[in-house]
Regions:
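Short strand-turn motif at the edge of the Rossmann-like AdoMet-binding core
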Residues: 79-80
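Substrate-binding N-lobe of the ribokinase-like
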Residues: 83
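Short, electropositive alpha-helical surface patch
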Residues: 86-107
Length: 116
């Protein structure tokens, strides 16, 4: 089989979270994910209680979850209409997880295998 299959390599994973507050199940699913697409309905840390009440996350909570899970990239998404410019709040997430970006309609990525 080695002549046909080549050397083993790590697979790829993408984890998508819809409306959700940070939880152990999401963190477990996101372990080592190449891309985590995660709810960021609220921008500010002081909105964490409100986010929890409605089953959502803040920019910082999603970034912290990505960091704990060892994800490689984080796309924040599902912004509240109160957030008119998600990029303005992005530095807060990037201070926790530097590979965080603001997701947008039509955004695309090609995930590449890491060669052995």
């Amino acid at each position: 089989p080695a002549e046909v299959l080549g050397a083993p390599r790590r697979g790829l994973s993408m984890v998508f979270s819809g409306d959700t507050a940070p939880c152990a199940a999401l963190e477990q699913a996101a372990q080592g994910a190449d891309l985590l697409i995660c709810d960021a309905t609220y921008a500010l840390p002081e909105q964490e209680a409100q986010a929890a009440q409605w089953g959502h996350s803040t920019f910082g909570q999603s970034a912290a979850l990505a960091a704990r899970a060892g994800a490689h990239r984080l796309w924040l998404t599902h912004y509240s209409p109160m957030i008119t410019d998600p990029e303005a709040d992005l530095p807060q997430a990037q201070s926790i997880f530097p590979a965080a970006v603001c997701g947008a309609d039509g955004m695309q990525i090609t995930l590449q295998y890491e060669e052995a």
